[in-house]
């Protein structure tokens, strides 16, 4: 082993230019691959953070039909999953006039996930108090000022607070509606509670929601995923990918463009293809440099027997 190492060092010293060229090719290829990979990773993280703002910082939601919130909190971390953040939204009532509006009570976790922060005033503390964002106030023709009276569905509420807008693209997933926030004690007997979950993103999110569902005896199909974030955090079911490919191959009018569009969520597949192409290119460059070096050595070695023959002939002549 030592002899091999010595031979390699001697070779590098003797053929400095070729060794330097090969080393430079390896370094430049590695630098190119690493640089592009880092660039893609930075872009991906920036896109993920932007998606959190546009869709909300959650992975799945489901009906929050738990016996008690205290019991649920005890199981935030279990075998195969870790709930990093959760929020509860209770829809007290929904009306269609003058607009599609939901009367909602939400806990701090939900408000945080949706980026709902108080700009003015306070969250409703009484049954006749209400809070909403500037967009909803504008549509209802109410002045953006706490203490204003708001008439909705035959009731009069006092505007206690003004919040920031809901995530811009949330209605694309849940329907076109506006929210007004009410006190926890206001009850119309039509409550629907929804649990929003964000799992630890250092692990596969789909596997975590599966483990979570099994732990609480909930069917995975009863969970609705946040499509805006799913491709970034691994929240898509493997069956979805296979089904997409089958559909694309089954229907000629769909074909490869359909498969690519469905699987290339947020451009992640494009990034992987480009990185794979760069890896192949880097390997080709290194291989080419190595082949050139080997070819030169082979040509030199082939001259040696001829030179030796001429030398012997000269000596005997």
Model-derived segments and spans:
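Transmembrane helix boundary and interhelical loop/hinge segments in multi-pass membrane proteins
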Residues: 43, 289-303, 307
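Conserved catalytic-core segments centered on acid/base and nucleophilic motifs
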Residues: 11, 283, 303-305, 312
């Amino acid at each position: 082993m030592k002899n091999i190492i010595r031979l390699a060092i001697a070779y590098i010293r003797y053929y400095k230019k070729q060794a330097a060229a090969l080393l430079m090719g390896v370094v430049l290829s590695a630098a190119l691959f690493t640089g592009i990979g880092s660039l893609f990773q930075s872009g991906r993280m920036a896109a993920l953070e932007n998606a959190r703002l546009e869709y909300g910082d959650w992975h799945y939601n489901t009906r929050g039909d738990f016996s008690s919130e205290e019991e649920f909190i005890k199981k935030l971390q279990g075998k195969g999953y870790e709930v990093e953040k959760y929020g509860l939204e209770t829809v007290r009532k929904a009306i269609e006039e003058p607009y599609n509006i939901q009367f909602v009570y939400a806990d701090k976790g939900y408000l945080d996930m949706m980026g709902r922060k108080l700009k003015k005033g306070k969250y409703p503390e009484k049954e006749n108090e209400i809070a909403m964002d500037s967009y909803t106030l504008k549509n209802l023709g109410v002045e953006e000022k706490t203490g204003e009276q708001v008439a909705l569905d035959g009731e009069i509420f006092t505007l206690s607070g003004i919040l920031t807008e809901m995530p811009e693209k949330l209605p694309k997933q849940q329907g076109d509606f506006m929210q007004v926030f009410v006190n926890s004690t206001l009850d119309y007997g039509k409550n629907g509670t929804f649990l929003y979950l964000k799992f630890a993103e250092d692990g596969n999110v789909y596997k975590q929601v599966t483990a979570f569902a099994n732990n609480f005896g909930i069917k995975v199909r009863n969970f609705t995923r946040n499509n805006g974030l799913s491709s970034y955090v691994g929240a898509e079911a493997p069956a979805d990918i296979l089904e997409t490919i089958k559909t694309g191959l089954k229907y000629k009018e769909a074909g490869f463009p359909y498969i690519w569009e469905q699987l290339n969520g947020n451009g992640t597949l494009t990034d992987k293809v480009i990185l794979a192409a760069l890896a192949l290119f880097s390997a080709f460059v290194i291989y080419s440099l190595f082949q050139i070096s080997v070819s030169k050595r082979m040509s030199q070695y082939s001259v040696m027997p001829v030179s030796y023959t001429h030398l012997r002939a000269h000596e005997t002549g």
